[in-house]
């Protein structure tokens, strides 16, 4: 029995190592390409030894962009951060307050309102996106941070998750708060919000990555290069006119784009994992 268990452990670790290598190898190739110059990156086969031009490529795209794209990539990263952070804060705020109202306030048709929110999950993005663009255009929000972020702040999934968590809180907490004279918002700030920290952390990480990785929405809502985001900007760096693509600079842009979401995951890893575990209980 012990030998079988040891064999299973070895097999699992081997598969884990293989999986890690399969994930990291493309990233390593991108890192190597980002460190080469214009001629080295087109050599066949391309070298797998990092070159000395990484900071040169990063500095160039940070200030000048790549190819026909005149927007500095540093500005694109800033736009992506503003978009991701605003979507994250807005989505958490709207979803948490909506779920709190549905669970703790008694008003007519509150369950109907919840299920109407939940039913939006059944609508494909392609069905909702063009009417949303029309609304944003009518409100003169094209090429603006408001247009980039406001339509993505509502989340049926986050509302559902917070509702399920709030329903697990014992009713005695609400009764004790009422005895102490606490109002609805006092109960929310002093009791519900602190108990939701791990769930907030997990949702913060997931939502930030969701906002950071937005590709289709920024392309449709912006035409000004200065409002472009990093993920959409990388695609615009790839030449479609027959001219050679500067892959070393494109890969440098990709490396920079990876840093913020990876940093968020690493900084909030403990609370993220705890939030996922707590949400399953």
From Swiss-Prot:
GO terms for cellular component: plasma membrane. Keywords: Cell inner membrane, Cell membrane, Membrane, Transmembrane, Transmembrane helix, Transport. The keyword Transmembrane helix applies. InterPro entries: MetI-like, MetI-like_sf. The chain crosses the membrane at residues 14-34, 82-104, 113-133, 142-162, 188-210, 247-267. The keyword Transport applies. GO terms for biological process: transmembrane transport. It is a multi-pass membrane protein. Residues 77-268 form the ABC transmembrane type-1 domain. PROSITE patterns: ABC_TM1. Pfam families: BPD_transp_1. It is found in: Cell inner membrane. Belongs to the binding-protein-dependent transport system permease family. UgpAE subfamily. The complex is composed of two ATP-binding proteins (UgpC), two transmembrane proteins (UgpA and UgpE) and a solute-binding protein (UgpB). Part of the ABC transporter complex UgpBAEC involved in sn-glycerol-3-phosphate (G3P) import. Probably responsible for the translocation of the substrate across the membrane. NCBIfam families: PRK10973.1 (NF008210). PANTHER family: ABC TRANSPORTER PERMEASE PROTEIN MG189-RELATED-RELATED, SN-GLYCEROL-3-PHOSPHATE TRANSPORT SYSTEM PERMEASE PROTEIN UGPE. This is sn-glycerol-3-phosphate transport system permease protein UgpE.
């Amino acid at each position: 029995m012990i030998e079988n268990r040891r064999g299973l452990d070895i097999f699992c670790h081997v598969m884990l190592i293989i999986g890690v290598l399969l994930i990291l190898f493309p990233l390593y190739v991108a890192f190597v390409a980002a460190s080469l110059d214009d001629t080295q990156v087109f050599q066949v086969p391309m070298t797998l030894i990092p070159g000395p031009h990484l900071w040169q490529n990063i500095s160039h795209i940070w200030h000048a962009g790549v190819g026909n794209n005149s927007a500095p990539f540093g500005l694109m990263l800033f736009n992506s951060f503003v978009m991701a952070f605003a979507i994250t804060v807005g989505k958490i705020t709207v979803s948490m307050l909506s779920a709190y109202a549905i669970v703790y306030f008694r008003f007519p048709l509150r369950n109907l309102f919840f299920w109407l929110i939940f039913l939006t999950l059944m609508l494909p993005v392609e069905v909702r996106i063009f009417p949303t663009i029309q609304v944003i255009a009518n409100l003169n929000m094209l090429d603006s941070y408001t247009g980039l972020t406001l339509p993505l702040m509502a989340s049926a999934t986050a509302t559902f998750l917070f509702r399920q968590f709030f329903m697990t809180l014992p009713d005695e907490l609400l009764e004790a708060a009422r005895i102490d004279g606490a109002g609805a918002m006092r109960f929310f700030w002093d009791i519900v919000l602190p108990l939701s920290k791990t769930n907030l952390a997990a949702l913060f990480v997931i939502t930030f990555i969701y906002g950071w990785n937005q590709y289709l929405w920024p392309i449709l809502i912006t035409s000004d290069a200065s409002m472009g985001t990093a993920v959409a900007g990388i695609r615009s760096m790839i030449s479609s006119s027959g001219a050679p693509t500067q892959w070393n600079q494109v890969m440098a842009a990709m490396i920079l784009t990876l840093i913020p979401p990876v940093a968020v995951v690493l900084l909030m890893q403990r609370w993220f994992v705890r939030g996922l575990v707590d949400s399953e209980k």
